Amino acid sequence: MTLSPYLQEVAKRRTFAIISHPDAGKTTITEKVLLFGQAIQTAGTVKGRGSSQHAKSDWMEMEKQRGISITTSVMQFPYHDCLVNLLDTPGHEDFSEDTYRTLTAVDCCLMVIDAAKGVEDRTRKLMEVTRLRDTPILTFMNKLDRDIRDPMELLDEVENELKIGCAPITWPIGCGKLFKGVYHLYKDETYLYQTGKGHTIQEVRIVKGLNNPDLDAAVGEDLAQQLRDELELVQGASNEFDEELFLAGEITPVFFGTALGNFGVDHMLDGLVAWAPAPMPRQTDTRTVEASEERFTGFVFKIQANMDPKHRDRVAFMRVVSGKYEKGMKLRQVRTGKDVVISDALTFMAGDRSHVEEAYPGDILGLHNHGTIQIGDTFTQGEMMKFTGIPNFAPELFRRIRLKDPLKQKQLLKGLVQLSEEGAVQVFRPISNNDLIVGAVGVLQFDVVVARLKSEYNVEAIYESVNVATARWVESADAKKFEEFKRKNETQLALDGGDNLTYIAPTMVNLNLTQERYPDVQFRKTREH
C-alpha cells in the first residue's frame, strides 16, 4: 500500500532536541549534525569571545559575547530520506523555562554526556522533564579524544541514576591520545578515527569483522585484543537494542565519539532517522489528535523577541501537530476565538529566516506576533480545543527589579509583561506594594532581562535580592475559605504576568505551614498555559 503524499511527508519528519549539562559539547554536536545534514559547509566551532566565527546556533547578542546558547532556535535539514527538525535548547550554566518547554514540543531527545564526567546535575533535571511524556532518548558519549571514564562504568551510571536501560550500539577503542575509533556491534564493523578532521566530513576507513587481522594492524594488537575482551563482557552484561522499549522510553541506544573531532555523530544520526518516531499524537482537553489527520492543528511552545534586531518584532514558535500548513491559510486562535490569516510564517536556521510555503506535522513554524499570541496557544482550522502539557514551572530564583529612572515605570511594566509572555522570565506584582518581582529557573535569565529591557524598551533597570524563596499558584473551589485566605495573607500574594493569583513565600517553612493551615486551597508548582 502506498501512502498518500501527505502521509509520506509526515513519515519523513523527525523532531528532536539535545539535552546535556553545560559544556558537554551540545553546541559542537549541533554544528556537526548540521554539517552532516549539509546545512552548513564548514562547522564553525564555538571559540573564545574574540573569535569571528560564531557557532551557527548561538545568536542573540549576549550569546555571541558569552559563547553560550540562550534562545531555543530551530534548524531543519535533510538526512538520508528524512527531514530532521533540531530544536536547540539553552544548555550553558544557566538555562530557563524555555528549555523545559521545548522538550514538550519534540518526539525524541538526544542526551549528550561528557564521557570524562558522566551523568551531571542538569542532565538529571532535563531527563525528569522528558519523563513527563516518556520521550524516547538516544545517548551520545562525547569527548572520546580526551581521557574518559571506563565505558562500562558510564553505562552503569546512566542506568542507575537516570533509570533507563543502556543498549550500546558502538563501542570505543581506546581514548584520549590512544583513541583509535569505534566498533559497531550490529554491523560488525570498525570505524577508524583520524585526528585533525573535525571541520569537514571525511571518508572514514572501515574494517569489516572483529577478528580481521587488518584490525590488529590498524589499532595495534593490544587495543584490538582489549576490544574483543570488552565486547564479550558488554554483550553478556548490557541490553540488546529493542525498538519497542526505546519508543516507550525504557532503553536508550548509546553511541561513542567525539563531536569536536567530527567522529561518531553520523552513527548517531543514522540511529535517529532509523528508530526515532515520526510525529506523535498529542492530547487536547477534548481528544487525542493524530499526525495523520489532514485538518491543521498546532500549539505555541515558545515566544522569542527581537530575532531581527532591525525590527522590534516577536516570533511565536508553533509545533505543527496535524495537517498541512499552506501560505495564506486561515487559522483559528482558540484562546481568543479569532480567525487569523497566516501569510508570512517563517522557518529558521538560527537567526536566518526564510518564508515557508508549506509545513507538515513535526515542523516548527514562526508566526509574527505583535503581542497577541501567548505560550500554550492552540491554532486549528475551527475546532475549539486546547493542547495540554505545555506548563509554566514555578520559578526557583527571585529578584526585585528597580528602575534607575522612576518615570519609566510604565515602559518597565510593559517590557516585563511582554518578556513574561514569551517565557523569558516570570513577573509578579505584589498586591500590597508597588514592587516588581521577577522569578526565573536560572540566574542568567535576570541578566538577560536587564539587557533586553535596555536594548528593546530603552529602560535602565537593576535587580536586587528580595525575600522570596518560592512561589505557588493558588486556587480553591471554596469561595468563602479562599476569601479568608486572601484577606489574611495579603502581604504574601501577588499577580503574575497573566493576572493569576500567586502565593510568594519568604521561606519553604512558611509555605509548608500555610499549606497546612489552608487545606482547602491548592498550591500548584506548575500551571497549564
From Swiss-Prot:
The keyword Isomerase does not apply. It comes from Salmonella typhi. Disulfide bonds: none annotated. The gene is prfC. Residues 11-280 form the tr-type G domain. It holds the Pfam family EF-G_D2. GTP binds at residues 20-27, 88-92, 142-145. It is found in: Cytoplasm. HAMAP family: Rel_fac_3. One of its GO terms (molecular function) is translation release factor activity, codon nonspecific. This is Peptide chain release factor 3. InterPro entries: EF-G-like_DII, EFG_III/V, G_TR_CS, P-loop_NTPase, PrfC, RF3_C, RF3_dom_3_sf, RF3_GTP-bd. Keywords: Cytoplasm, GTP-binding, Nucleotide-binding, Protein biosynthesis. Increases the formation of ribosomal termination complexes and stimulates activities of RF-1 and RF-2. It binds guanine nucleotides and has strong preference for UGA stop codons. It may interact directly with the ribosome. The stimulation of RF-1 and RF-2 is significantly reduced by GTP and GDP, but not by GMP. Its main location: cytoplasm. Gene3D superfamilies: P-loop containing nucleotide triphosphate hydrolases, Peptide chain release factor 3, domain III.
